[in-house]
């Protein structure tokens, strides 16, 4: 099964960004933040309604966090490997992915990791998607997931598939990665389910 985005690809790009950002001045860092914020306010934002999905299951781990997905969705692993937690509806179209950016992924020390903020990581992901030939449109927005403020990278693939990536820092200091990809019809119900159900501990 093949999904649009590979977290390993994003991590390589974030590694370069993190290594660069740790040596930047505060002025340069502020400039990057402003750039992403201007992008988010200038672009459209998806309006999320209440999810109508009632029959759900909790997926995830203590390392990656937990979300609810439809009970009929199944776990799968990429043929090329990777450490994502992924569930799909039985097709290669509608997919939820969970992961966490760790210091070793970003190529930084624990102290450098603690000094990073979500906008730095999200800006790198945003730029990677913008430069990809797979997408016809990429824009940024802000939202809340599990009560946390998140930077959201929204993409429309050339085949019409949508990709939504939430990047945020949870209260345990970890940078979280959650993505949802699929058709507009599926995203309509899945978006609020993901945003309302994410938690870093299983209830």
Write out the residue ranges for each language-model feature.
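Secretory pathway targeting signatures of secreted, lumenal, and periplasmic proteins
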Residues: 62, 66-115
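Short, hydrophobic/aromatic-rich segments at coil-to-beta transitions
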Residues: 52-58, 81-84, 144-154
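Signature of long, low-cysteine stretches enriched in small and polar/charged residues
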Residues: 122-168
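N-terminal, intrinsically disordered, polar/charged segments of Gram-positive cell-envelope systems
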Residues: 6, 24-70
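Positively charged n-region of N-terminal signal peptides that target proteins for export
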Residues: 1-4
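Short, solvent-exposed coil/turn segments at beta-strand boundaries
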Residues: 71-72, 90-93, 146-148, 168-175
